[in-house]
Swiss-Prot record:
Cofactors that this protein relies on: [4Fe-4S] cluster
Organism: Thauera aromatica
The entry's keywords: 4Fe-4S, Aromatic hydrocarbons catabolism, ATP-binding, Iron, Iron-sulfur, Metal-binding, Nucleotide-binding, Oxidoreductase
Stored PANTHER family: BIFUNCTIONAL PROTEIN [INCLUDES 2-HYDROXYACYL-COA DEHYDRATASE (N-TER) AND ITS ACTIVATOR DOMAIN (C_TERM), BIFUNCTIONAL PROTEIN [INCLUDES 2-HYDROXYACYL-COA DEHYDRATASE (N-TER) AND ITS ACTIVATOR DOMAIN (C_TERM)-RELATED
Pfam families from the UniProt entry: BcrAD_BadFG
Protein name in the entry: Benzoyl-CoA reductase subunit A
Amino acid sequence: MECFVGIDLGSTTTKAVVMDDKGQVLGRGITNSRSNYDTAARVSKLEAFIDARLSLIRRELDKEPAVAGRVDEIIDGLTRNFRREQFIEQLGDLEQTCVANVEGPRFAGKEKAIVGALTEVFRRLREEEADKLFAPDAQRKSDFFRDLAGSRFMQIGEEVARANGVEFDHLLHMYDKSIIEVENRPPSADMNRKFRSAMERVRGEMSSALDTAALGAPIDAALEIDMSERYVVGTGYGRVRLPFPKEHIRSEILCHGLGAHLMYPKTRTVLDIGGQDTKGIQIDDKGIVVNFQMNDRCAAGTGRYLGYVADEMNMGLHELGPLAMKSTKSIRINSTCTVFAGAELRDRLALGDKREDILAGLHRAIMLRAMSIISRSGGITDQFTFTGGVAKNEAAVKELRQLVKENYGEVQINIDPDSIYTGALGASEFARRAVVEA
C-alpha cells in the first residue's frame, strides 16, 4: 500500500498525517517539537504510521462476525497496551541513560548509592506505575513520554531518595540530563512485536467476554499489509529545518487552507491559532488561498501566550478553558503581549479579582486580536472553520462564537476534533497530488 505523508512542524508540537492514494486518511501522529526538529519529524511520522496500522486492524476486525459490536473496545485495548509497550521500552532506555550519566567529581564516592536508587525508581515505574497509567479506565493528562515518566519519577524519586539516604537533587539531575537524550532518540519502529504483545494483553482482559481466538487472524492480516512511504511534504513554523528537498516543502498558509477545505468543502474563511502565530485565511471552492493575514512580529495572543499564563498561574494548559468557563464576569485585559502578561495578571490578582474572571478576560482579548486579523484578511464568509490547538479550548471557542455573531451574524462555525492536524492534512494531500495527479 502506497502512503503519502504530510508533516506540520509547529513551534510546540509536530503533527503528521498518513493518507492513501484515494485521499483517505489512515493515521495521525503528534509529538512535542523538542530542540531537534529532525527527531520531531521522525517521531510524529512514526506515530502516524502506528495510528494507520490501527486503522487497518479496525478494517480487518470489521469483517469478523465473532467480534461484532466489540471492535471499538478491542481497538481501545490494543492502543492502550501498545502505548504501554512503548512506555516500558522508553523507560528502559531512560534508565540506561541515567545510569550511564552517573559520573564526574560531583558524584565521586556516591555512584553506587545513586545507581541503586535509580534502579529502584525504575523498577517501581515498570512494575507499579505502567499498569496504572494504561489501565482501561485510566485518565492521562498527556500521552507524551516526558510528561508521563516525569511526574511519577519525581514522586517516587523523593520517596526512594529518603529511604536510601541519597540526595534527591542527584536523581533529579540524572533525569533532567537524560530525558533530553532519550527524547531525541525515536522509539524503535518494531511495531509488529509491540502489537502482538498488546494483543496478548487484550486477550487476557477480554477472555471471559469474547472468543479471543477470533482476534488473531484479522490482526495478523492487518500487520502483514506492507505500507510504503511514497512521498512526503513538510510544512509549518519550522519547515525550513525539515530534512526534505525544497520541492517537498509547502507554505503553512497553503496547507492550512487546503486542509480546512478537505475537512469542510464549503469553508471560505479559516482561522488558525497555533503555538506561535495566528492566521486568517480566505479560500475559494477548491481550497486555494485567495488572501491571508498573520500576526506580525510577536506571539501575542497565541498558544504560547496561553502557555505562559498557565505557568504564571501554576496550572496545566488544559485547565485554563474549563476554569474560564466558570467566570461570572469578564474582566478587561489591556494586553495580550506575553512579556507584560505576567505583570497584568499579578496586578489583577492583587486587586482581588477571581482567577476565572481574569482568564475569561484573557480569552476574550485573544479572540478580539484574532478577529482583527480575520478582518484584515477580508472578514468572515460562510462557512467559517477554526483550527489549531487553541480550537480545543472551550473558553476560546465560546468567545469566538459570540464575537462572530456580534460582527457577522449567523455563520456556520466548523471545529473538527482533529483540527490540530489541519496543516499536516493539507501537506499530505499535496504529497498525494504530486504523485497521483502528476
